[in-house]
Amino acid sequence: MECRFFISIILFVVLLNPSLIINMVLGYVLGSLFRSNYSRLKKLLSGNKNENREEEDEHISQMKNPFEDAESDVLQHLKTLGLETKVEGDDLEYLQRLWESMSSKK
């Protein structure tokens, strides 16, 4: 009796919503594929991150100073306002660490 009851409930669910069964089967298949190939997938994704980081480092090193072409009176005015564009020492290290942490969170 219980077996017939469970089979009738399963049959009712399949007739009512067959896409649920299809989604469950596809989820099981994809989950088993990911589980069996997880290490390869992890290596593939981490390899892409390292390549992207190298490309970003090259791009950062190629960036030019935006105030390089500014005239001397503009630079003097920026200096009087305290907006000099040179960053050195501890400030430079702090900004580099900040940039690395922001770029790694993407």
Curated annotation (Swiss-Prot):
Keyword Transmembrane tagged: yes
Keyword terms of this UniProt record: Membrane, Transmembrane, Transmembrane helix
Transmembrane segments: 5-25
Subcellular location: Membrane
Domain of life, per lineage: Viruses
Any one GO cellular component localisation term in the record: membrane
Membrane topology: Single-pass membrane protein
Family that this chain belongs to: Belongs to the nanovirus U4 protein family.
The protein's name in its UniProt record: Protein U4
Lineage start: Viruses, Monodnaviria, Shotokuvirae, Cressdnaviricota, Arfiviricetes
